[in-house]
């Protein structure tokens, strides 16, 4: 037995150098083997990797190493999602150039990732801020422009008047800019958009074919695309109350069945009818101005107090010319959704009910639950949105909701006004075109030129890339590109006159919407992709990343792939065949009495205190309480809830510290073993120590097995005895179960089977004092299989063990061992036992046991004896391999 401990600090750098020198993870595009493309979402170069990165990239690495061992040509690349606001913030706060800050961070994080022992093809590495990358992004923008998939249009945006920039909805907090604190204004500005809505139905339909995606992600995308079938209804406006030039109000509704419950109309603050009414009523103008100060995020609008102002305009009910409905400007209606106008049926929509209760407009229920008396059915504070029959609806009374919708549709489609139907069936989508303009410096320049004579002129392909200037200043608010003295001033490529560059840059989601395709051939200087290569290597077979990207990144990537197909850059629609969303890494939080958060690294030892108390019944109850102290002062700390690791709560653990103390393999093993990969993993120092102990245990098993392996014959024995068969069954059973777990991405299950197998092998080693040749052979075979099973998870340790066992080459290049199916067959079978049809227990017998042996084993069961209670047995019915029934 070896007494020498495994030394991760010496071993891990050694094998990392060996892998790098031998270039064993470099992928050849012309490799004839079947391809397998595994990709984890590439990181933003913030400067440090965190434990979430360790978990994410370890999962991908296990898949990559396993598929490589199984004979696939594995593509497993890495790059950097490098444009974005943090680099500009660093420039402002630390007076460092965004480019320098970004590339310094990339260098630091790459070094950290390399210590993890990931099987990455670093030759394909790029950063999205490399001009050699965004040159091709600019080319695709121009291709999209030619194809009508990119356009410039006026859009309502959130404007920060202090920072002088457009804010995303998420950057508006309580109506103020997240950084400046200024009151946000809504403005209309020219913005570049990608026409993602062209693919709304296709993006929706294709979700059904993404059967290796999580259901929750597909549901989130379905809801975001938001297909709804309804009617477009033209409400006439009462001429006596309506501004000149306005005659009707179009609304889209999915609940045309509730038209007889209408109590008001509501329009967006920027609806043409609202703008027409404002000049004659200062209160309407003031209300519209107030609405403009609020963000445009749907979530903010949904939670804000519902407010409106009566315009004095009246709309005419489509089924009753005498029925006039008040038209309100409302803060909860957006011009971007539907037609920017709605009819309010408060009895059956909670938002509408809150509104009418505020303005005392009343409500009339028009759908009554089945079995309830319509005469007594009333609505007060809670709207009814369930199924039922129509009431208070004239010709619709008694119909179901679907029948009522159909009847309304037929009548409105045949009724006309001014030669056009009053209503028509329509499909509406919640999805809106993707606005990509950002008033930021650190992003991909949009390759167009604005000429006073020629209008918008694309930058010629020969002049790409349009490169960002490096001599920029962030002393003034707004976009540094706007303030640059020379960069934006150019000659129009069409007329030769004076012109200016577009100073908006692209949304950083554009950069990450096609990087996976670029990885297939990042050396192509002439085009974004090499068609025969990208069509061979795509789609990504297994994509791994956080569920927070379920909508925007994944949906934009799906659109972008379709747009690339339409412009000849790829030949497929879907970029990711398989999608997996891993859980977060979470940790306890600790706080001082002053409220200051404390890092786990600052803790003294943790103590668990038990106390025994007697409850009201006199029974003694034991309770446990953990206590922690601040190392520096001895102050007892408050143990807070377990939360996602974050800098703000200081509950982070530095991967460098863990890898430096325990080694990368220990960190990898812990991240995989503690919980199912789609759930959060709770960081535990004890759990890490347990993983470290298992590393040492495997090292001892490998060394002990190596001693016995010296006694093994070179050739496979003709026969194996019972002990050898047991070892081989354990090995091949584990081989089958571990691979099954990896294929299902149930890494924690695979690791549990590895532990079970390691224990079984250790037991066999403990008993193998003087092993027979067949047992020595079986132990050597089992040890080799154990090392190969561990290799995807703990590759450095596996290489050391592989060497100790006398195996040639690298385990990272070894083929996956083959399972012998005969060794998966169990020798025993467990049968349920009934007495007079009622289950009384189970009996385990040899699979080939004869009926007399089964009967004897059944009658020997204590539970059967108790059930018989001395009664004679009439007969025993045995259904082979299924069940036994004793009849008395």
Swiss-Prot record:
CDD domains: Anticodon_Ia_Leu_BEm, LeuRS_core. It is found in: Cytoplasm. GO terms for molecular function: aminoacyl-tRNA deacylase activity; ATP binding; leucine-tRNA ligase activity. This is Leucine--tRNA ligase. GO terms for biological process: leucyl-tRNA aminoacylation. It comes from the Bacteria. Keywords: Aminoacyl-tRNA synthetase, ATP-binding, Cytoplasm, Ligase, Nucleotide-binding, Protein biosynthesis. It catalyses: tRNA(Leu) + L-leucine + ATP = L-leucyl-tRNA(Leu) + AMP + diphosphate. Belongs to the class-I aminoacyl-tRNA synthetase family. The keyword Plastid does not apply. A motif ('KMSKS' region) lies at residues 644-648. A motif ('HIGH' region) lies at residues 43-53. It holds the Pfam family Anticodon_1. Its EC number is 6.1.1.4. SUPFAM superfamilies: Anticodon-binding domain of a subclass of class I aminoacyl-tRNA synthetases, Nucleotidylyl transferase, ValRS/IleRS/LeuRS editing domain.
